[in-house]
């Protein structure tokens, strides 16, 4: 009997929900939570261990989390490693991809995971492993787990894995020599394809070329002291009554909120409606996501000309790239009308960061220098944000509530200052700016 190990997050490992998203890595003998379902559909293998780690812990302390999990595996024998399914949960998808990639590289064992097409982990890891095409929520658990097991069973049995479209995983960009059953030569196939194209019929290319959507880096701000700076967020900060009825996930709406005369955003007046993380910290102090207080300080010091009268907000969790791009284009109109010179984008969880980076590209495409502040740097980088400043966490990007107000302020002030400086820097390639606090 072969041995398998499964990685799960805190939810599917039955530890808890968002309140346990900081759960530290743990390895358990046998099957827990979703691992029991996997064990029931594996053939010729048994899930001997279940690894559980909170999504926020993996996202915020990735190196430590990976190191500890690698330590768990040092004395374990296993023939295959699986993770998920992650559905459309961005943090979970990125975590599954990260740990599978390291396990594959270190232990030279096959790895399998599953994600929805809109999960940012797909673009990040589909070339490195079998990423099964999954559903968008846990209602697809049984189907997605069975699909993972189907490929795993073939691997365990030493059977040949077929093409991506037949097996149900995302194409990995690998080409193999294949003998067609019909024996039709390339010369005939290309003529058939051309005739279909000329007659307007559907046809399938044998060599898909991936499209690159990198945006030219906008010209930097020359004089920050005269510039108007706006904040856009995918972190869901809105007035407490949510006047624009922005959805808490898979958003199709956005809002613009007047901050004229406000020194900071007060809890109880503003809140987050974002369903992708524990809202407690952001509800208590919305400035940890929309750093109005820090921007006002820089405005008074003369570092920037002024803060734009409005901030713009939507929810990024589960939001499709198409909707993100559309909303960004609509916001661009308002930015132009408001005479904005530069933009700071703040983002939180995985799909939220993917949504934010997609919006960043559209805003930069319109000519605005823009920087994305986020915790999940690999997601922003993969999607194509050109200027990135790290934040400290998913639920509270710019202020850890477990620290003093003074410490939170110093961190927020410093990192927002770094973002403002980034708007003035002329870079020729994607750049992650270093922070000191």
From Swiss-Prot:
Active-site residues, as the UniProt record annotates them: 349
Keywords (A to Z) from UniProt: Oxidoreductase, Selenocysteine
Catalytic activity: acetyl phosphate + trimethylamine + [thioredoxin]-disulfide + H2O = glycine betaine + [thioredoxin]-dithiol + phosphate + H(+)
Gene Ontology molecular-function annotations: betaine reductase activity
Membrane-spanning intervals of the chain: none
EC number(s) reported in the record: 1.21.4.4
Pfam families: GRDB (PF07355)
Protein family according to the UniProt entry: Belongs to the GrdB/GrdF/GrdH family.
Record-linked NCBIfam families: betaine_GrdH, various_sel_PB
Known partners and oligomeric status: Heterotetramer of two alpha and two beta subunits. Component of the betaine reductase complex, together with components A and C. PB is substrate specific.
Function summary: In the first step of betaine reductase, the substrate is bound to component PB via a Schiff base intermediate. Then the PB-activated substrate is nucleophilically attacked by the selenol anion of component PA to transform it to a carboxymethylated selenoether and the respective amine. By action of component PC, acetyl phosphate is formed, leaving component PA in its oxidized state. Finally component PA becomes reduced by the thioredoxin system to start a new catalytic cycle of reductive deamination.
Annotated protein name in UniProt: Betaine reductase complex component B subunit beta
């Amino acid at each position: 009997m072969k041995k398998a190990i499964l990685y799960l997050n805190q939810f599917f490992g039955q530890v808890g929900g968002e309140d346990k998203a900081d759960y530290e890595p743990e390895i358990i003998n046998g099957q827990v939570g979703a691992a029991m379902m996997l064990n029931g559909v594996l053939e010729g293998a048994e899930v001997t261990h279940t690894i559980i780690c909170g999504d926020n812990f993996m996202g915020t302390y990735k190196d430590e989390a990976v190191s500890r999990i690698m330590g768990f595996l040092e004395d374990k024998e296993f023939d295959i490693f699986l993770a998920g399914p992650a559905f459309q949960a961005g943090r979970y998808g990125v975590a599954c991809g990260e740990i599978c990639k390291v396990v594959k590289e270190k232990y030279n064992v096959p790895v399998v995971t599953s994600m929805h097409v809109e999960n940012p982990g797909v673009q990040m890891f589909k070339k490195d492993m079998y990423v099964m095409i999954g559903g968008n929520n846990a209602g697809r658990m049984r189907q997605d787990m069975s699909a993972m097991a189907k490929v795993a069973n073939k691997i365990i049995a030493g059977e040949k894995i077929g093409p991506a479209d037949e097996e149900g995983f995302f194409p990995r960009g690998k080409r193999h020599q294949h003998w067609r059953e019909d024996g039709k030569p390339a010369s005939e196939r290309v003529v058939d394809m051309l005739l279909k194209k000329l007659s307007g019929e559907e046809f399938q290319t044998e060599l898909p070329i991936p499209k690159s959507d990198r945006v030219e880096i906008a010209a930097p701000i020359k004089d920050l002291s005269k510039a108007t700076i706006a904040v856009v967020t995918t972190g869901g900060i809105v007035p407490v009554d949510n006047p624009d009825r922005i959805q808490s996930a898979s958003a199709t709406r956005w809002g613009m909120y007047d901050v004229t005369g406000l020194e900071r955003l007060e809890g109880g007046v503003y809140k987050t409606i974002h369903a992708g993380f524990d809202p407690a910290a952001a509800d208590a102090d919305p400035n940890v996501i929309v750093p109005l207080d820090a921007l006002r300080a820089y405005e008074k010091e003369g570092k920037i000309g002024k803060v734009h009268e409005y901030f713009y907000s939507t929810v990024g969790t589960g939001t499709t790239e198409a909707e993100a791009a559309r909303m960004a284009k609509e916001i661009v109109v308002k930015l132009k009308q408001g005479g904005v010179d530069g933009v700071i984008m703040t983002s939180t969880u995985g799909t939220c960061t993917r949504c934010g980076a997609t919006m960043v590209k559209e805003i930069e495409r319109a000519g605005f220098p823009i920087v994305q502040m986020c915790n999940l740097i690999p997601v922003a980088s993969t999607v194509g944000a050109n200027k990135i400043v790290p934040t400290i966490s998913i639920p509270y990007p710019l202020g850890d509530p477990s620290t003093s107000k003074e410490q939170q302020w110093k961190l927020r002030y410093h990192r927002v200052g770094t973002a403002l400086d980034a708007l003035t820097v002329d870079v020729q390639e994607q750049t992650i700016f270093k922070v000191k606090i």
